[in-house]
């Protein structure tokens, strides 16, 4: 079999290894494999993996689908490994459930595949998150995209119009005049306005969503973290003006998510909606390697008990005859909860941009599937 051979899903082949290559997702070939060696491989959609899931030889005759880019930056976002991840999605499902929506890159990829007739969804698409402000952003993209874009554009134009000067940084400007002295001042002014509006007005207001998007793009590496007084992530100090979504891109996203049901609720409640034949993707706050791991996604965070509860509920999906894929860190808590004898585990190398000292640092993640 060579690069021109027709690749058939769910079939085993014995081939002579001619070339080793990494995919964009960074799945590494085993170091023991050598050119000229005969090896039996399990063939998956669009490529080949060995029985342990460690080798991926891409089918070079199949071009990658260009997925819609997400609107938001998000810690732990899957944009960099999305081409690898979606290869493990089932080609047909009853309903799709995404329990930790975040930046939405996986949801947008799935919807792109559905539009291109690569995946068939017989029922509905559900997207859940415990972050109410985030869910409201997507709802406003669905129903109020024109007003949302106008409000966001107002903040962007004001931000772009602020020129550099020698005025000292003021992280607590008392009024708009002080806020307009520096871009950093303006960020903190809008952050305070967001926290005030989110607390005192309708949380689903278009202006709250516009502020959410603006702050997300100008804060430190797309983090979302809440404290007692609300959103508290510092300014991002980007050398170039961050790239905000264009009107045409917003229209594309709005069209893609038109029939998605966005739901603000806990993952415990979300599991109750899953039925036989459904497919579930979970990308929770990652299980920690140590006490410094980032878990401040929402005000009360994820603790050990929360992770264990999530893992048990995920494993119960077997009893419902539902398929799932979970992304998580390759740490002891995860690997012991999902033994290889019972679940398929795929190792993936990913960049962890939350690292302040080394933003290009990488780590090993896992895809867990039943």
Residue spans of the language-model regions?
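Mobile active-site "lid"/loop adjacent to the S-adenosyl-L-methionine
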Residues: 226-240, 286-307
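A structural motif corresponding to the C-terminal end of an alpha-helix
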Residues: 246-261, 311-325
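Basic helix-extension-helix modules of the SAP/HeH family
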Residues: 1-57
């Amino acid at each position: 079999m060579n690069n021109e051979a027709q690749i058939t899903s769910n079939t085993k082949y014995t081939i002579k290894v001619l070339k080793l290559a990494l995919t964009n997702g960074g799945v590494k070939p085993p170091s023991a494999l050598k050119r000229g060696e005969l090896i039996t491989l399990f063939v998956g959609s669009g490529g080949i993996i060995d029985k342990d899931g460690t080798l991926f030889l891409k089918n070079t005759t199949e071009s990658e689908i260009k997925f819609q880019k997400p609107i938001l930056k998000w810690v732990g976002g899957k944009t960099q490994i999305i081409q690898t991840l979606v290869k493990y999605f089932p080609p047909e499902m009853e309903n799709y459930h995404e329990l930790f929506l975040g930046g939405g890159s996986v949801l947008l990829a799935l919807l792109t595949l559905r539009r291109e007739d690569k995946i068939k969804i017989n029922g509905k698409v559900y997207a859940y998150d415990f972050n109410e402000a985030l869910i409201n952003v997507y709802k406003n993209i669905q129903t109020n995209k024109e007003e949302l874009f106008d409000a966001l554009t107002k903040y962007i134009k004001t931000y772009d119009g602020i020129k550099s000067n020698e005025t000292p940084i003021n992280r607590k400007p008392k009024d708009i005049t002080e806020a307009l002295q520096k871009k950093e001042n303006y960020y903190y002014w809008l952050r305070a306005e967001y926290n005030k509006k989110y607390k005192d007005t309708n949380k689903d207001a278009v202006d709250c969503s516009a502020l959410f998007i603006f702050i997300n793009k100008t804060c430190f590496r797309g983090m979302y973290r809440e404290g007692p007084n609300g959103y508290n992530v510092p300014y991002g100090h980007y050398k170039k003006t961050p790239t905000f979504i264009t009107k045409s891109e917003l229209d594309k996203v709005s069209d893609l998510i038109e029939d998605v049901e966005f739901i603000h609720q806990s993952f415990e409640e979300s599991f109750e909606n899953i039925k036989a034949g459904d497919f579930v993707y979970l990308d929770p706050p990652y299980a920690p390697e140590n006490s410094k791991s980032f878990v401040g996604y929402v005000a009360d965070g994820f603790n050990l008990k929360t992770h264990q509860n999530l893992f048990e509920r995920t494993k119960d999906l077997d009893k419902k005859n539902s398929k799932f894929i979970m992304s998580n860190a390759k740490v002891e808590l995860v690997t012991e909860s999902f033994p290889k004898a019972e679940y398929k585990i795929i190792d993936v190398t990913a960049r962890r941009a939350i690292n302040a000292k080394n933003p290009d640092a990488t780590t090993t993640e896992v895809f867990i599937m039943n």
